[in-house]
Amino acid sequence: MKNNGGTRVVVIGTGFVGASYAFALMNQGIADEIVLIDANESKAIGDAMDFNHGKVFAPKPADIWHGDYDDCRDADLVVICAGANQKPGETRLDLVDKNIAIFRSIVESVMASGFQGLFLVATNPVDILTYATWKFSGLPHERVIGSGTILDTARFRFLLGEYFSVAPQNVHAYIIGEHGDTELPVWSQADIGGVPIRKLVESKGEEAQKELERIFVNVRDAAYQIIEKKGATYYGIAMGLARVTRAILHNENAILTVSAYLDGPYGERDVYIGVPAVINRNGIREVIEIELNDDEKNRFHHSAATLKSVLARFFTR
């Protein structure tokens, strides 16, 4: 049972991403209870000890401990960060065979506890594994969320802000689609201070247009670059997961680019994919269908088709 009647988050998988996410939760005071579960129990025990030793410095100290699947029964949110890691040269979709089996075991164990909360999935390929979590759990699709393109969108806003010398918080631009090689930028709706980004570069000539495309390529390929340099990405996605968690637990109705189930929006059905969605205490309140130009529509449908072709190997649809 919950110790204080507050919010409980269970983190499954305390590798680089899971531990960084728990650290972000502690530092931002987002949850009242944080439970760490890992196949390597010793790692989870050590992480819990380490976090507790720093609790005195936290803005809102949480109760944090290593636990087991029974702790999911009273959880508001279960965040899955477990699974095989992406190696140099691997695409996110290369991981699917390894991680589907892992996820079946995890999700069935969570549901056996009597869990009635929300799932947030971070493991790659995140769109595929979010769909798998929905299927394995039997929960309504609005209560199963993937991290989607939240980090890609953050990278996009950062690089555009750097290029235009403005704070990334004031850049309004989205990356949608698969969290992976077929994702796309929505240039037609991107703006800074209400001024379309395409208009901002009109007077700067062809080289400025090429620079925008280079910015997107750097966003799309950022994970490959980071993995090559340091072996894994974890700080950025951990902060993105913390942002989604805050939107859920604080009932914010925040619009974030997560992996959401589509059943009509954007002309797609039966697929989880990165799109802007309203996030609150109940999960995904609604998908925001932004207007796309013809090229963006075609690229989005291609991205969805790529995901569906992978899903067809594992699920009858």
From Swiss-Prot:
Known PANTHER family for this protein? L-2-HYDROXYCARBOXYLATE DEHYDROGENASE (NAD(P)(+)), L-LACTATE DEHYDROGENASE
> What are the annotated GO cellular component locations?
cytoplasm
Q: What single Pfam family name could you report for this chain, choosing any that match?
A: Ldh_1_N
Q: Where does substrate bind?
A: Q86, R92, N124, P125, V126, D127, D152, T153, A154, R155, T233
Entry keywords, A to Z: Allosteric enzyme, Cytoplasm, NAD, Oxidoreductase, Phosphoprotein
Task: Tell me where in this chain the PTM Phosphotyrosine is found.
Answer: Y224
Q: Report the source organism.
A: Bacillus caldolyticus
Which pathway does it serve? Fermentation; pyruvate fermentation to lactate; (S)-lactate from pyruvate: step 1/1
Which protein is depicted?
Answer: L-lactate dehydrogenase
What role is this protein assigned?
A: Catalyzes the conversion of lactate to pyruvate.
Query: By its UniProt entry, which NCBIfam families does this protein fall under?
Result: L-LDH-NAD, PRK00066.1, PRK06223.1
